[in-house]
């Protein structure tokens, strides 16, 4: 800390952009600005690296990475006079004052500079004020000061010798002891002392005192004397004090010390009552990218590395580690309360996390933990998990009066047995912006390649046996907090702005190995569960067995990029999509209709928006316009899919599709909707959707009375859509001379063995030589490929009259059902 008596030099910690100048000065050129670190300082240039906002305030224009302080000091020139007197000039008081002030400034700065140098302390010694003294010469006399390098060089051999000797030495007070035998002679024996007090090896016989001592020294020794294999905050002492309840004591350091001790000893931490926490001991890292692009994309010139994002942190009370086990006496007994209040607290980087959980590899690895039997009250974020939660267990957890129950980078094989939430948002998994490549393969992940796609933050096999969620109305201050929380998540976690290309002000690479578009963030509040894949990697097997919700302004569940294995099996969903629950399902009280959702309207069913399946649900108080679905098994009727809604808007009831992992092709088969059903003609490759018609062309032949004739143009175009084949035949004949009653037929390979039934086809015929009032119908025999022309619906074959016909055009369009 700088001496408070120093007036012409001020230092500020970095982090802000604008800084005050607390002292007066005669000219801006007498003010100097520096970036300072413990080992470096850099003077900044006015205009290009900082500018004046006002006479008493400056604004930085450069990055402060690598420095921890901003220093502003006055350095008045002793040679460059502000006022210069000459003979015969008018002598004014103002000039005299300025001249005197310049001298005073110089003297004041000299005094401040002296106070920053080595100065006498009260006891007569010299005080360097905690600064490093450099350029010290090699000591000559025993009383001379020595450099660290000199001391290290002199002490190192001695320390090595002492350490080597002490490793083979037993020490006693006031006497010498004799040397022990070698290691091979004392292995497996205890150390005893003879009558003279010298150490001697002792054989540890079974059942002897010596044997007991060996067992007590083992890893299970505590169990032999009735010891406990756990720790509690009540066992800990902090600054000589023990934990006391009911007196407003901050319990955070007692709990953290117990967590640290439990982690060190690999034993659980037991929480048995109510705890209050105020101090935020930890800085939890928020997501950021390192600025790098996939090296091959940089090498080919399409992309380049950019500056890394600034590392920001969220304040946290408690830190859990890999394999931490926290066991409460039950969520009705073991409570832990923070200070965040929905009615008064802000939403920002200082809003506290209760449980910050991170493993040794951070966001490039997994973390496993157990959290049971605890009620968390008044935390902005209940659990904040850096890395992929792997095989973690949560049970009997309650979160009350929180902003977000959980924010997690990802989950794999994590089970949540009973989770009860009263908060603006439930558990939010995924969506962390941790790298800037538009891809989701490991080779595209920093440090190129990563051992797995940790930075994508996937969510697979996350199961909730029972999840209860109660939200808050979108009204008054609660409406503001809803918006603040979604904005916080977008600003610091999801970072929608980063999805734009660099040239558009974002951070996404220009090149892509991602066949799918990056997802759009929806509002995270007013939902029990939110799963999103930031880079479009698929999420699979995320299941909620039983869901109970009350007051969800949005669809209670949201999942994107998920497979059909993601399901909510049973649900009771009450008061959905209402602005105020007490006002009921009435006009003017619908969120998303009467109040526009800033993050986009819900498009899925009320139980589950995005992708996934909601199997059974009971809905009370439903916002109109959004459907609900059930899938139930009826006795004697197989599987029945039920659907209902409060409007008649057209919507999908059921879709069937299949996926071929070998060819990476996803084909949509059938789409059943409320007003029609169809077979969708699309399939999806990694490069996007393609038409999935079976189609082709062939060359037909034209015959008159069975004899083939020459034509100028003949082509058949055919394609298949579901169970229907459609065939279009086009023929041009420049000139043809016919005898009376001549029959013209067309043979096309497109029909080989394909016609299912004999008789007339469904189609039309255009013939340029037809006279008015005559219509023709195309006919094909079963299994044949010859098209004959008949008059209207009669069996009469159309026959040409004798004569020469020029510029004949024949067009036949026919639909038929194929045999296969």
From Swiss-Prot:
UniProt-listed InterPro entries: Phage_T7_tail_fibre-like_N (IPR005604)
Main location: virion
Keywords on record: Degradation of host capsule during virus entry, Degradation of host cell envelope components during virus entry, Host-virus interaction, Viral attachment to host adhesion receptor, Viral attachment to host cell, Viral tail protein, Virion, Virus entry into host cell
Disulfide links within the chain: none
Protein localization: Virion
Pfam families per the UniProt record, alphabetical: Phage_T7_tail (PF03906)
Residues spanning the membrane: none
Gene Ontology process terms (BP): adhesion receptor-mediated virion attachment to host cell; symbiont entry into host cell via disruption of host cell envelope; symbiont entry into host cell via disruption of host cell glycocalyx
The organism's place on the tree of life at top rank: Viruses
One cellular component term from this protein's GO annotations in UniProt: virus tail
Function in brief: Functions as a receptor binding protein (RBP) and probably mediates the attachment to the host capsular exopolysaccharides. Displays a depolymerase activity that specifically degrades the KN1-type polysaccharides of Klebsiella pneumoniae capsule, which allows the phage to reach the host cell membrane and bind the entry receptor.
Entry comment, domain topic: The N-terminus anchors the RBP to the virion. The central part and C-terminus probably binds and degrades the host exopolysaccharides.
Assigned protein family: In the N-terminal section; belongs to the Teseptimavirus fiber family.
Subunit structure as annotated in this protein's UniProt entry: Homotrimer.
Protein name: Depolymerase, capsule KN1-specific
Protein species of origin: Klebsiella phage KN1-1 (Bacteriophage KN1-1)
């Amino acid at each position: 800390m700088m001496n408070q008596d120093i007036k012409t030099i001020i230092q500020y910690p970095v982090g802000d952009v604008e800084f005050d100048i607390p002292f007066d000065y005669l000219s801006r050129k007498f003010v100097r600005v520096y970036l300072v670190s413990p080992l470096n300082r850099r003077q900044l240039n006015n205009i290009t690296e900082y500018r004046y906002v006002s006479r008493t305030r400056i604004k930085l224009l450069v990055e402060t990475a690598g420095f921890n302080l901003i220093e502003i000091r006055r350095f008045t020139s002793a040679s460059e006079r502000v006022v210069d007197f000459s003979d015969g000039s008018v002598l004014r008081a103002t000039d005299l004052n300025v001249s005197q002030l310049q001298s005073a400034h110089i003297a004041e700065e000299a005094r401040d500079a002296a106070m920053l140098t080595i100065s006498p302390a009260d006891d007569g010694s010299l005080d360097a004020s905690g600064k490093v003294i450099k350029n010290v010469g090699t000591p000559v006399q025993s009383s001379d000061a020595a450099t660290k390098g000199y001391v290290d060089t002199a002490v190192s051999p001695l320390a090595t010798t002492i350490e080597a000797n002490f490793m083979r030495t037993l020490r006693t007070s006031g006497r010498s002891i004799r040397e022990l035998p070698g290691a091979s002679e004392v292995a497996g024996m205890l150390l005893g002392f003879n009558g003279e007090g010298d150490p001697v090896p002792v054989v540890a016989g079974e059942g002897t005192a010596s044997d007991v001592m060996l067992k007590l020294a083992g890893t299970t020794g505590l169990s032999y004397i009735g010891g406990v294999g756990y720790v509690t905050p009540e066992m800990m002492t902090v600054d000589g004090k023990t934990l006391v309840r009911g007196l407003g004591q901050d319990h955070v350091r007692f709990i953290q010390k117990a967590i640290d001790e439990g982690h060190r000893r690999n034993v659980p931490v037991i929480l048995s009552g109510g705890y209050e926490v105020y101090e935020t001991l930890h800085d939890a890292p928020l997501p950021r990218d390192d600025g790098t692009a996939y090296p091959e994309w940089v090498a080919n010139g399409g992309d380049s590395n950019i500056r890394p994002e600034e590392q920001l942190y969220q304040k946290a009370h408690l830190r859990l580690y890999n394999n931490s086990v926290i066991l409460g006496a039950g969520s009705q007994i073991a409570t832990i309360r923070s200070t965040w209040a929905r009615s008064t607290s802000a939403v920002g980087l200082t809003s506290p996390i209760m449980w910050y959980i991170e493993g040794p590899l951070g966001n490039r690895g997994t973390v496993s933990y157990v959290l049971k039997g605890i009620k968390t009250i008044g935390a902005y974020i209940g659990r904040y998990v850096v890395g992929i939660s792997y095989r973690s267990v949560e049970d009997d957890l309650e979160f009350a009066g929180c902003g977000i129950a959980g924010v997690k980078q990802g989950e794999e094989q994590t089970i949540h047995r009973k989770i009860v939430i009263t908060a603006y948002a439930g558990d939010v998994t995924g969506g962390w912006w941790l790298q800037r490549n538009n891809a989701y393969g490991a080779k595209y992940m920093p440090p190129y390649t990563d051992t797995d796609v940790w930075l994508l933050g996937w969510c697979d096999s996350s199961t909730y046996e029972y999840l209860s969620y109660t939200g808050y109305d979108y009204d008054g201050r609660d409406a503001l907090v809803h918006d603040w929380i979604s904005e916080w998540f977008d600003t610091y976690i999801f970072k929608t702005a980063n999805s734009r290309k660099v040239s558009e002000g974002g951070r996404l690479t220009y090149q892509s190995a991602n066949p799918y578009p990056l997802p759009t963030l929806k509002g995270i509040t007013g939902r029990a569960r939110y799963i999103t894949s930031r880079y479009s990697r698929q999420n699979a097997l995320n299941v909620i067995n039983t869901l109970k919700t009350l007051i969800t302004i949005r669809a209670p569940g949201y999942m994107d990029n998920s497979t059909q294995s993601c399901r909510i099996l049973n649900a009771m969903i009450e008061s959905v999509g209402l602005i105020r629950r007490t006002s009921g399902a009435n006009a003017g009280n619908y969120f998303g209709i009467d109040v526009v959702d800033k993050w986009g309207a819900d498009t899925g069913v009320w139980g589950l928006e995005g992708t996934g399946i909601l199997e059974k649900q009971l809905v009370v108080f439903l916002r109109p316009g959004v459907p609900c679905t059930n899938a139930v098994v009826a006795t004697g009727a197989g599987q029945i899919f039920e659907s209902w809604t409060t409007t008649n808007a057209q919507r999908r009831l059921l879709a069937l599709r299949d996926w071929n992992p070998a060819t990476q092709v996803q084909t949509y088969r059938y789409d059943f909707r409320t007003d029609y059903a169809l077979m969708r003609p699309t399939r999806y490759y990694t490069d996007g959707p393609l038409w999935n018609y079976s189609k082709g062309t062939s060359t037909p032949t034209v015959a008159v009375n069975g004899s083939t004739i020459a034509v100028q143009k003949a082509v058949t175009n055919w394609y298949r859509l579901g169970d229907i084949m459609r065939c279009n035949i086009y023929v041009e004949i420049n000139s043809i001379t016919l005898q009376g009653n001549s029959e013209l037929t067309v043979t096309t390979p497109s029909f080989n063995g394909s016609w299912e039934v004999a008789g007339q086809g469904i189609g039309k015929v255009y013939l340029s030589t037809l006279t008015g009032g005559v219509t023709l119908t195309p006919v094909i025999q079963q299994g044949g490929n010859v098209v004959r022309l008949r008059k209207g619906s009669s069996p009469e074959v159309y026959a040409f009259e004798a004569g020469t016909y020029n510029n004949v055009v024949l067009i036949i369009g026919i639909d038929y059902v194929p045999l296969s």
